[in-house]
């Protein structure tokens, strides 16, 4: 079922609609150029996102994407279930968008493809619509195109600082803290434990410097994403120690931002050896601007 999610209340459709075309699994640097162009004419800005696509895990969950889009200044998201649109011809796809929103502007990248067998192109849009069409060149960083595929490759390698260059913000997850075995508390490092969201593309397992916001305050910290071999626990979790925080986070939803990769996960000979390493990890984090 097609679904429109309004990110701001009481939209005024008389403003017109500028529609961004693409997959929009989050917003990378190229997408943000499209958004800037769409906002130039004072219209409402909408973008589409594909739900349940053929490319496997997404970079962000639906709530995470909506947060990114809203913070970037978009007004609405048009959610398109892949199963419902995969057989539409390019013309049928274009007609669907015009029927739903009567846009006065389409904005896309030069590599945008759509419709059955991806036969639709920016030139096709220009030929078959009377709507203004803006086609922007691809954005490159260090000589390589910015894309979701590139971001996923970097995540698989733990290169989250380069991911930030591509996304223009830190890679993050949002999840609810649950009560676990409280091993961290026992050794002096209480952690907020979150299950990695189902369907979200996994980053490389390891220990990361992270930033977590609680009640409007950002806390530096360290996050173990993966198993806990020192305690013979192979469950994959996201365990975050918030430096300087005291309080109960159970049941609360947290946003954890991954700042940089610190080290691989390893099995220590004892809890004391692990504690010594964690103290070294947090010292590195405190000294990092």
Spans of features found by a protein language model:
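Phosphate/ribose-recognition catalytic cores of enzymes acting on nucleotide-derived substrates
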Residues: 180-289
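Short acidic-hydrophobic, aromatic-tinged amphipathic segments that line or gate anion-handling sites
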Residues: 1-9, 78-79
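Classical nucleotidyltransferase
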Residues: 88-191, 214, 269-273
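Short histidine/acidic/glycine/proline-rich micro-motifs that form metal-
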Residues: 25-26, 52-56, 82-85, 111-116, ...
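Residues at the starts of beta-strands that form the adenosine-phosphate
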Residues: 43-46, 75-76, 104-105, 132
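N-terminal catalytic cores of NTP/NDP-binding nucleotidyl/phosphoryl-transfer enzymes
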Residues: 8-63, 67
């Amino acid at each position: 079922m097609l679904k429109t999610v309004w990110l701001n209340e009481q939209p005024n459709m008389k403003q017109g609609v500028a529609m961004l075309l693409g997959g929009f699994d989050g917003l990378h640097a190229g997408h943000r150029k499209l958004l800037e162009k769409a906002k130039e004419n004072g219209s409402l800005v909408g973008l589409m996102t594909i739900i349940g696509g053929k490319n496997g895990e997404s970079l962000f969950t639906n709530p995470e994407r909506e947060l990114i889009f809203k913070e970037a200044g978009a007004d609405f998201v048009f959610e398109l279930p892949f199963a419902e649109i995969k057989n539409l011809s390019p013309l049928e796809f274009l007609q669907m968008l015009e029927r739903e929103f009567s846009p006065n502007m389409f904005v896309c990248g030069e590599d945008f493809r759509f419709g059955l067998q991806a036969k639709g192109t920016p030139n096709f849009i220009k030929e078959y619509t009377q709507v203004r069409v803006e086609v922007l060149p691809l954005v490159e960083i260090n000589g390589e195109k910015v894309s979701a595929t590139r971001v996923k490759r970097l995540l698989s390698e733990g290169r989250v600082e380069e991911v930030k260059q591509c996304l223009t913000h830190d890679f993050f997850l949002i999840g609810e803290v649950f009560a676990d075995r409280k091993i961290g508390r026992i050794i002096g490092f209480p952690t907020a434990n979150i299950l990695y969201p189902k369907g979200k593309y996994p980053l490389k397992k390891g220990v990361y410097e992270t930033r977590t916001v609680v009640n409007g305050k950002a806390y530096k910290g360290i996050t173990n994403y993966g198993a806990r071999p020192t305690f013979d626990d192979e469950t994959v979790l996201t365990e975050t120690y918030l430096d300087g925080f005291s309080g109960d986070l159970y049941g609360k939803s947290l946003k954890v931002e991954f700042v940089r990769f610190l080290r691989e996960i390893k099995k220590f000979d004892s809890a004391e050896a692990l504690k010594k390493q964690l103290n070294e990890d947090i010292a590195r984090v405190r000294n990092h601007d």
